[in-house]
Amino acid sequence: SHKVSGGLHGVGVSVVNALSSKLQLTIHRAGQIHEQEYQHGDPQYPLKVVGETSTTGTTVRFWPSGDTFSQTIFNVDILARRLRELSFLNAGVKIVLRDERVNFEHIYAYEGGLSEKSALDIAGLPGKLADCQEKDPALSELYLVEGDSPGGSAKQGRNRKMQAILPLKGKILNVERARFDKMISSQEVGTLITALGCGIGREEYNPDKLRYHKII
């Protein structure tokens, strides 16, 4: 069921190794080239020095195990979506996707990361937000209402001093299951992020900037 990961966070190459019939590591570090090979998760020899280098970096090559996967052909569309998400999250990192089967290459690089994503307009509050007069987040409440009609009724019956109303169109996207790029391109999600005021992403998110301490 896991299309782009082994299912766990923070395990990296160990999961890839366990799911591969063969894995090769080539490490450029401290002027030396180190190499090690695994087959079905087992090391074939200790890490060894095979040459000299003036660069740094690591190359990982792996062959998915036919004993684990019914199909071992890589789907470039799935890889492209995942790498695009990673490029949004890691500003300044260049990721190159190359498919030598069809002579395809694409480079993903977002210098500003999420801060440049046009889907999130953080210049001002959403137009449909009926904000409250209270400026202290601890005393402010935000009510999320489905649809414009219920939103209008809620605006009329609210306490303007401490209650804000934000109408959202239909059922909001399930962000727990959605791809990251699809999530931040959703107008309703973008509106909600802007209204809350605490941003999104590793560099931008700050819970201290949350504008409402009670959200209903």
Curated annotation (Swiss-Prot):
UniProt keyword Nucleotide-binding present: yes
Leader peptide range in chain numbering: none
UniProt xrefs under SMART domains: TOP2c
Annotated Gene Ontology cellular component terms: cytoplasm
Intracellular or extracellular location(s): Cytoplasm
Keywords of the record: ATP-binding, Cytoplasm, DNA-binding, Isomerase, Nucleotide-binding, Topoisomerase
Coiled-coil region(s): none
Catalytic reaction annotation: ATP-dependent breakage, passage and rejoining of double-stranded DNA
Ranges of residues in domain Toprim: 140-216
First-level EC class: isomerase
Function: A type II topoisomerase that negatively supercoils closed circular double-stranded (ds) DNA in an ATP-dependent manner to modulate DNA topology and maintain chromosomes in an underwound state. Negative supercoiling favors strand separation, and DNA replication, transcription, recombination and repair, all of which involve strand separation. Also able to catalyze the interconversion of other topological isomers of dsDNA rings, including catenanes and knotted rings. Type II topoisomerases break and join 2 DNA strands simultaneously in an ATP-dependent manner.
Subunit structure: Heterotetramer, composed of two GyrA and two GyrB chains. In the heterotetramer, GyrA contains the active site tyrosine that forms a transient covalent intermediate with DNA, while GyrB binds cofactors and catalyzes ATP hydrolysis.
Similarity comment: family membership: Belongs to the type II topoisomerase GyrB family.
Note: Few gyrases are as efficient as E.coli at forming negative supercoils. Not all organisms have 2 type II topoisomerases; in organisms with a single type II topoisomerase this enzyme also has to decatenate newly replicated chromosomes.
Protein name according to UniProt: DNA gyrase subunit B
Native source organism of the sequence: Acinetobacter sp. (strain ATCC 33308 / BD413 ErpE27)
